[in-house]
Regions:
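Extreme N-terminal "head/tail" segments of very large remodeling/mechanoenzyme assemblies
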Residues: 1-203
Length: 203
């Protein structure tokens, strides 16, 4: 049985703007009107990673605000979403020099099961000429073994939307790397190396 993880206590999610740096951590990717046809962050999600079971974040006009007391997990959550979900660089996970964050730590902190698979993802949308939108979703899958003290990651990019066109879990169990590749099919790619993933995202 998979141990239940949850959103860190005392953290409130809002898709709005606020400049109170003492209580808020924010991602701001809003574009100017002249650049409105560019991809803009629309949603992000964490599935079975760190203290999360499943959590979706909706951006308002490209902005995301997390409110909470010091130590509630705002900075760690933002670092998991950006930039880590975009480049797969594990060194980006360390919020401060006081605490080094590894993939193994993310998957085993507060979790006592034998093994765990989870996902971190972000979704971008941009308007199309016909009044619709074009989607781009990318993210990282992580597998950890508590008994062997190991963790590995893979990365993916697709034109499909999580929860709309496909799911990252099957009957509550996060997909394996191989199963994800099957689900994405010709509409996406799965990368073993973070460098190849980063190059693809940067195109």
């Amino acid at each position: 049985a998979r141990a239940h993880a949850r959103m860190p206590d005392t953290m409130e999610i809002q898709a709005t703007a606020n400049d109170d740096a003492t209580t808020n951590s924010a991602i701001d990717t809003a574009t100017t009107p002249a650049a409105s046809a560019r991809f803009r962050l629309h949603r992000a999600g964490i599935l079975n990673v760190w203290q999360y079971d499943t959590q979706e974040f909706t951006f308002g006009e490209g902005r995301l605000l997390l409110r909470g007391a010091n130590g509630a997990g705002k900075s760690k959550t933002l670092e998991m979403l950006l930039p880590f979900a975009l480049d797969g660089d594990k060194s980006r996970l360390t919020a401060s020099a006081k605490h080094h964050t590894s993939l193994l730590w993310l998957m085993t902190d507060g979790y006592d099961g034998p093994g765990r698979v989870g996902y971190i993802w972000v979704e971008f949308l941009r308007p199309t000429a016909d009044g619709g939108h074009e989607a781009f979703t990318c993210g990282v899958g992580i597998r950890a073994s508590g008994s062997q003290r190991t963790a590995s990651a893979w990365h993916f990019a697709t034109s499909k939307r999580v929860g709309v066109d496909f799911a990252l879990d099957d009957d509550g169990s996060p997909l394996s790397r191989g199963r994800l590749a099957e689900v994405l099919g010709e509409d996406g790619q799965v990368f073993e190396r973070a460098t190849a993933y980063k190059e693809h995202i940067g195109r």
